[in-house]
Amino acid sequence: MSKVLQCCQLSKSYIQGDIETKVLNDLELSVDKGELLAVVGSSGCGKSTFLHLAGALDSPSSGKVLINNIDIHQLSDKERAKFRNEHIGFIYQFHHLMMEFNAQENVAMPLMIRGEKPKDALLAAKEMLDQVGLSHRIDYRPSQLSGGERQRVAIARALVTKPSLVLADEPTGNLDSDTAEQIYQLIRSLNKTAQTSFVIVTHDLVLANRMDRQVKLVQGQLRPLSDNSEQALPPTSSITDPANNIKDNEPQANERHV
């Protein structure tokens, strides 16, 4: 089976003054086409750093990241931005939708950034919103949508470019259990339909154990998650929101622009 993502001896260190902190240490990973991979780990273990490197948002101290056999960190900044747009989708715990645009316009944005005609981009966005069950909400702005609906818009935006790899950071972490289940079923359905690979960072081991494979980030390296009886890990403070457990039928009207 073809490999969508390969991390080879991937290391990342941060230096502050005379202190060097090694976050990732010769990390190795291989993700197959169409695979659903869960990454878990304790707070501050480097999961966000890993996602940034895998998504070409940051550069490693050493090692390689290959997506579809392309060494993404050998590309120029312009080439890397183009590659991200064409091959990688991103889903976050907080949707990061543009509040001044409606759902269809938000989903169409990556295609318009790519240079596609607005008419074609909006049509593709409409079709994608239909796939995630939101064709009746295309004219709604984020402030008019519930938490679950906004996350579905974010998923549609991540997939509208037909990426081979989607990187998701706590995609259900800010949702109640019923809405989280809907999002999981949506991800599983889209994964099956398009054979898109997903790498999902989560603290929820119940969700993680429903993926095809689970790994745990420990001491800068990824290891198989062998103990499926573990309880959910505590959330990372930097991504924890006080308005947790947003219900799917509760619109959030007072969101800030992002």
UniProtKB/Swiss-Prot annotation:
Domain (ABC transporter): give its ranges. Answer: 5-244
Q: Which domain of life is it from?
A: Bacteria
Stretches of the chain forming a coiled coil according to its record: none
Which is a GO BP term held by this UniProt record? lipoprotein localization to outer membrane
This protein's GO cellular component annotations are: plasma membrane
Main localization (coarse): membrane
Q: Which InterPro entries match?
A: AAA+_ATPase, ABC_transporter-like_ATP-bd, ABC_transporter-like_CS, ABC_transpr_LolD-like, LolD_lipo_ATP-bd, MacB-like_ATP-bd, P-loop_NTPase
Q: How does it sit in the membrane?
A: Peripheral membrane protein
Q: Which Pfam families match?
A: ABC_tran
Entry's SUPFAM superfamilies? Answer: P-loop containing nucleoside triphosphate hydrolases (SSF52540)
Q: Where in the cell is it found?
A: Cell inner membrane
UniProt keyword Cell inner membrane present? yes
The UniProt keywords, alphabetically, are: ATP-binding, Cell inner membrane, Cell membrane, Membrane, Nucleotide-binding, Translocase, Transport
Q: Where is the composition biased (Polar residues)?
A: 226-243
> What Gene Ontology terms describe what this protein does at the molecular function level?
ATP binding; ATP hydrolysis activity; transmembrane transporter activity
Sites where the protein binds ATP? G41, S42, S43, G44, C45, G46, K47, S48
Region of interest: Disordered: 222-258
| Biased composition, class Basic and acidic residues, residue ranges | 247-258
EC number(s) in its UniProt entry? 7.6.2.-
- Assembly state and interactors? The complex is composed of two ATP-binding proteins (LolD) and two transmembrane proteins (LolC and LolE).
What's the family? Belongs to the ABC transporter superfamily. Lipoprotein translocase (TC 3.A.1.125) family.
Physiological role: Part of the ABC transporter complex LolCDE involved in the translocation of mature outer membrane-directed lipoproteins, from the inner membrane to the periplasmic chaperone, LolA. Responsible for the formation of the LolA-lipoprotein complex in an ATP-dependent manner.
**Protein name, please?**
Lipoprotein-releasing system ATP-binding protein LolD
This protein's gene is called lolD
